[in-house]
């Protein structure tokens, strides 16, 4: 009898531990816990990778265009100390995707046609016009965006900064990392994009429309 009781205690103890373990496994983890710190740490890691790219990876960083655009005289003369959040960071498929040759730069007033997806650092997708893996031979759903100086509240500084360095028909999509200071700031946007969110965009420019482009006959 004592042996049976002993085994029963052992079995119950094992079941209790099992249930306790299951309960811990099913605890709901807040994906936005310590959100500011996680995003700042994530951006620091991206800045480090961009500064010291692994073999075979192509990275560039682009300065927030508004630093010089808002006050070109004072910003060019003052010893401004750039921070990691003063840049957007772009990972390209190849070095050839960076160099534009004689292609005109994207500028204010232009319209760009592009395929894109937007994500947060926890993998939550918040926007886009395609799903899954981008394939330039298959993807044909492009959205046109006007390039504006943040007149429209839907535009963010980092989005415009990145677009101004894109070119059409790259070998593949580029991945753009935008710090929250160049995104939706401390307040965020809507229910999905919380404050302090680093924005990650997969971006492929299909076409650039220059409304004021002149021809040789106009010169």
Model-identified regions with their sequence ranges:
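C-terminal motif of bacterial Sec signal peptides marking the signal peptidase cleavage site
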Residues: 17-21
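Cross-family detector of peptidyl-prolyl cis-trans isomerase
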Residues: 2-5, 22-219
């Amino acid at each position: 009898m004592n042996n049976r009781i002993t085994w029963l205690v052992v079995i119950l103890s094992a079941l209790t531990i099992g249930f306790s373990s299951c309960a811990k496994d099913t605890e709901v983890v807040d994906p936005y816990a310590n959100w500011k710190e996680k995003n700042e740490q994530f951006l620091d890691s991206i800045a480090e990778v961009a500064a010291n790219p692994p073999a075979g990876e192509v990275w560039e960083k682009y300065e927030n265009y508004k630093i010089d655009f808002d006050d070109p005289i004072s910003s060019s003369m003052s010893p401004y100390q750039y921070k990691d959040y003063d840049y957007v960071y772009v990972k390209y498929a190849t070095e050839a995707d960076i160099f534009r040759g004689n292609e005109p730069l994207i500028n204010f007033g232009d319209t760009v046609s592009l395929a894109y997806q937007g994500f947060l650092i926890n993998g939550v997708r918040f926007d886009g016009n395609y799903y899954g893996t981008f394939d330039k031979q298959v993807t044909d759903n492009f959205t046109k965006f006007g390039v504006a100086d943040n007149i429209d509240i839907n535009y963010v500084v980092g989005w415009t900064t990145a677009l101004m360095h894109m070119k059409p028909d790259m070998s593949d999509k580029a991945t753009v990392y935008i710090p929250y200071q160049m995104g939706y700031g401390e307040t965020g946007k809507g229910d999905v994009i919380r404050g302090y969110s680093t924005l990650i965009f997969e971006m492929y420019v299909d076409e650039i429309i220059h409304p004021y482009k002149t021809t040789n006959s106009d010169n």
